[in-house]
Structures are given as structure tokens and as C-alpha cells.
Swiss-Prot record:
U1 snRNP is composed of the 7 core Sm proteins B/B', D1, D2, D3, E, F and G that assemble in a heptameric protein ring on the Sm site of the small nuclear RNA to form the core snRNP, and at least 3 U1 snRNP-specific proteins U1-70K, U1-A and U1-C. U1-C interacts with U1 snRNA and the 5' splice-site region of the pre-mRNA. It is found in: Nucleus. Keywords: Metal-binding, Nucleus, Ribonucleoprotein, RNA-binding, Zinc, Zinc-finger. A zinc finger (Matrin-type) spans 4-36. It comes from the Eukaryota. This is U1 small nuclear ribonucleoprotein C.
């Protein structure tokens, strides 16, 4: 029966079977010999050897094994990494780590504006600076926010929307914009002060849509 010779360990294996080769390649001595070999040949030559290994896999039409296949009890060759891209062979991956080569073993999530893979959840874009994300209500609309003027919470026609919570005896004037998050509107004279005006509003100017008696600090 033919025997398999390991160039890294300089030994003959007892059998030339796939199971014997996998058991030998996952051994501690073999992995250490592979790392020592690629550390001795240098960075440029190690990169050329890795390229030749990957090209040989591509020429034969075989999927490259995963790095996890080097551990005992792991799955066999042919697994792929994140994003559907194949990983380097065990020897090449160990050599790349030893020689300090940068190998993309995983891919970051897609940026905003690009479609994700089927079945992948993409987080929503971050809120503007200084503003917490609004809570979601029915239909994905922000709770306590009725949308733009003339639209309801579901983006339909005029009318509807989530109404603000009022104290007993209060009436919402026409054109009043409810506060976000379903906050309760206090009555006039209850010590409630509006936040300072944002950029673009002159100091002391009334806010658009605010009821009488509600003005920025310092307004008369």
C-alpha cells in the first residue's frame, strides 16, 4: 500500500487515506512544523506559496477547507466563511497568521444604503447627534408622533395620528405639534419651560405651532 510523505514533518504516514491525512494535519506537531516553515521562508515567498495553494484548489474546482477543520471533531472540508466566501486551507491559514499576513476570514455587515443578503437583518441607521431613537408604535411609526402635517401615523391621508396625552380640562389648539414619545402636555403656568431654540431660530422668537403662553426662555 502506498504511503504519504509529509514535507513539513519529513515523515511517511502509515497509510495514504484521507482519514489518516486529516488526523496527521490536525496534530500539534504538524501545525507547529507548518508555522516554523513559513516563518523561515519570509513574507514574500510565503505569500506566493499561499497563492499557489489557493489557485490549485480553484483549478481543480474543489472548495477550500475551513480553518475550523483543523480542530478534532470539526466538520470536513468545504465549509465557507461569512458572506459565502471560501476560507484558506488549514496550512495556508496557519502560515498566514504566523507570517503576519492579513487574510479576510470574515466580512463586515453591509453599510447603509446597500442591500443585505436574503434573510439578514440590517440595523437601522443611527439617530442624529443628541437625539435618542424614537420608540416604535403600530405600523412602524414613532409613538406620539403624527408625522408630517396632513398625514396620519401610517403615512396615509389627513386626520389620524397618535394624539398627545392631555391633562383634564385642556384643549389642543389648531396647528399644535404634539411632543415626541407621547409626553403629557402641562397646563400654562405649571413651571414648564421650553428648551432653548435650535439653530436657525432667533432668541425670543415663538416656536411655530406652539399655543399661546408657550415660548422659549426669556420670551415675554
Amino acid at each position: 500500500m502506498p504511503k504519504f510523505f509529509c514535507d513539513y514533518c519529513d515523515v511517511y504516514l502509515t497509510h495514504d487515506s484521507i482519514s489518516v491525512r486529516k488526523a496527521h494535519n490536525s496534530g500539534r506537531n504538524h501545525l507547529r512544523n507548518v508555522v516554523d516553515y513559513y516563518q523561515q521562508i519570509g513574507h514574500e515567498k510565503a505569500q506566493s506559496v499561499i497563492d499557489s495553494i489557493t489557485s490549485s484548489y480553484a483549478a481543480e474546482g474543489q472548495p477550500m477547507p475551513s480553518v475550523h477543520s483543523t480542530t478534532p471533531g470539526a466538520g470536513g472540508a468545504g465549509s465557507v466563511g461569512a458572506g459565502g466566501f471560501p476560507l484558506l486551507p488549514p496550512s495556508a491559514a496557519a502560515a498566514a497568521a504566523a507570517a503576519g499576513l492579513q487574510m479576510p476570514l470574515s466580512l463586515p455587515p453591509p453599510p447603509f444604503g446597500f442591500p443585505a443578503r436574503p434573510g439578514m437583518m440590517v440595523p437601522p441607521p443611527p439617530p442624529p447627534f443628541g437625539f435618542p431613537p424614537p420608540p416604535l408604535g403600530r405600523g412602524g411609526a414613532a409613538a406620539g408622533f403624527s408625522g408630517f402635517p396632513g398625514m396620519d401615523a401610517a403615512g396615509g391621508g389627513a386626520g389620524g395620528g397618535v394624539q398627545p396625552q392631555l391633562l383634564p380640562g385642556m384643549v389642543v389648539p389648531p396647528g399644535f405639534v404634539p411632543p415626541p414619545g407621547g409626553m403629557m402636555v402641562p397646563p400654562p403656568g405649571a413651571g414648564f419651560t421650553m428648551p432653548p431654540p435650535l439653530g436657525g431660530f432667533p432668541a425670543g422668537a415663538p416656536l411655530p405651532g406652539a399655543p399661546p403662553g408657550y415660548g422659549p426662555p426669556g420670551a415675554k
